[in-house]
Each structure stands twice: as structure tokens, then as C-alpha cells.
Amino acid sequence: MGIRVLTLSDVETPAVYSSRIRSRFGNTDLVISCGDLPSYYLEYVISMLNLRLYYVNGNHVQRPESEDNAERYEHPWGAINLHRKVVYDREHDLLLAGIEGSLRYNDGPHQYTQGEMWRMVLGLAPQLASNRVKYGRYLDVFVTHASAAGIQDDIDKAHQGIDAFRWLLATFNPRYYLHGHMHHYNPLKPNLSQFGNTTVVNTYGYREIEI
């Protein structure tokens, strides 16, 4: 049996933020958030399921009324931030990496140009190459908020995909690519697709996958 992963992004859902979360998701092994969710929501999931939670921030960050709590709102207690990191989860024998945010379209937080995204992605490359030597593979799961260029993205500036993400997928062939940001209300738009050997998942709301 594979690793059962609960993926989250963008909107709070009653199925997750519920007193019945343990009965609904009690067989989950790991939680991954792709951004734009408040810290209290992620902390609730961590405390109720007692599981490790990896995350990246989205481009919408809820600001606290008091600056004393600012750090907590961007970095939920007990969660592991994947932004610009390559992480080996020893318990699940899983290699993860992540990049936060979206393409820059206004002066909001966690927005970057294509060039800035390239620099961050290329910064992951040495450790991904090292993974190949140590573990026999580059990467299992790539986690972002925005989508990759030409893969479940859109034409407007805010939702254009990231060129560097597409390059990473083509170069390092992770088994799974998880992203948020794309609010798909149209059932005809796919939330699950394939790019080469990589399964691409839009995690809008929540999805349960097995890795």
C-alpha cells in the first residue's frame, strides 16, 4: 500500500474543518498544503489528525490584526515550510521540494517574476542532483502554489503558469506535482492530468491521493 496523502489549498472546506475530521480522514499518512489557507485551519488539521504537514504559502496571506502574531499567520505552528527547500521524509521514504507564491501581478505578498522563479528553482537543482546519487531518484513530490506553464494554468496574468516549474518537471521527473491557485468551478476543466511521467494534481479544496 502506498502513502495516503491529504492535499489542501485555497478554500476551507466543511469536510476538513469539522469535528468529524478523524473519522473522515483517519487513515491519512501525510498532509500537504499548496497555499492560500489560514494558519488556524492548517493547525486544526495537524492537531486533530496528529500528522506531519508540509506547506508552501500562496499569494494571498491573511494579515493579523496584531503584528505580534504576524509570524504565526505565515508559518503555522507545527507545519514544515517547503519553500526553496528539498526535504527527505525518512518515515515515508519521500523526497519533497517546494516553491511558494505566484507570478507577480500586483504589489501583494509572495509574488515573483518569471526570472525570480527561475532563480529559486535553479537553487534547488544541486540538491536534487545529490538526491539521485543518495537515493537513486531526484524527487518524488514537487509542491507549489502556482501551476507550471501550459499545465492546468490560465491566460490571465495572475494565473499564468511558471516556466521554471515546467522545466523542473521535465528535467527531474517527480512522481507527483501538487499545486493550488487554480479555482476550477467548471467540471470540464481537469484537476488531474499527466505530464510525462508526472501526475499533476490541482489540490483546490482538498484531494486524497495515494503515492
Located regions from the model:
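N-terminal active-site segment of His-dependent metallophosphoesterases
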Residues: 1-48, 130, 134-138
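Binuclear metal-dependent phosphoesterase catalytic core
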Residues: 2, 19, 86-91, 168-172, ...
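Active-site neighborhood of phospho(di)ester-bond hydrolases with catalytic His/Asp-centered motifs
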Residues: 7-9, 30-36, 54-59, 82-83, ...
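Conserved catalytic scaffold of divalent metal-dependent phosphoesterases
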Residues: 7-16, 57, 61, 69-159
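Metal-dependent catalytic neighborhoods of phosphoester/phosphodiester hydrolases
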Residues: 18-21, 37, 41-50, 62-77, ...
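Short, well-ordered coil/turn elements that cap or connect secondary structure elements
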Residues: 26, 48-50, 74-77, 82, ...
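A short, gly/pro- and small-residue-rich
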Residues: 49-58, 162-165
